[in-house]
Amino acid sequence: MCIRDRSSTNGVMTAVANDETAIGYISLGSLSNDVKAVTVGGVEASAETVKDGSYVLSRPFNIVTNGDATDPVAVDFIAYVLSKDGQAIATDNGYIGEDGADFTSAQPEGKIVVGGSSSVSPLMEKLIEAYKTVNPNAELELQTTDSTTGVSGALEGTYTIGMASRELKDSEVEGGAKAAVLALDGIAVVVNPGNTTDDLTVDQIKGIYTGELTTWADVQ
C-alpha cells in the first residue's frame, strides 16, 4: 500500500492512476475516471451526501484576505463569488454552495492576483471567467500553488486573495488572515481503478494514514 499525499491535486491523481497499490484523497469536484473513488462507510461521495451529512469527509474552500479586502476589484469579486450567481457556479460544478444574494457589479478597474490551493483552483478559474463577463474592466490573474502558500501570499501581499482548502490555523488568524467560505467540498478517497476495494470505514482510513494498516490485505 502506497499513500499518495501531495500538494497538487493532479499529482495525487496521476500517482494513484499509475500505482495499483496507491491511495490518496482529492477534491470531489476534481474526480475523474483516471482513479476510483471508494465509498466511506457505505456512502458514496456526492454533493447531496456531503450536504445532508451522510458522507462524513468534507472541508471548506476558503478565500483569504489580509484583514478586510480593500482593493475595489477584490471587494467586487468577493461579493460576486459569494452571490447567488457565484454560488450557483459552485453548485453546478459539484460543490456545495449557499443561496447567496443578488449581485450588481460596481465595475471597478484594476488587476488582482488570486492564488493558492490546487483543489480550489478549478472552481476559481470558472468563477474568474464568469466574473470577467460581468465586469470586463477588471483583470484577474490566477496562480495555482497550495493552501499554505495561499494564506501566506495573502498576508504578504503576493496575492490579493488567497485560496485554502482547509480551515485557517490559529497562527494565521493571529497574523491577520481573514477567511470566507466559498463552498463546501467533499473529500474523495481514491484508489487505482484496478484495486478491488470499493469501501473503507473512517477507522480504516485513519489506520492507513497513521501507518497501522500497511497492506490492502489488512482492510479486507
Question: Could you describe each region identified by the protein language model?
Answer:
Residues 4-220:
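Exported/periplasmic ABC-transporter solute-binding proteins
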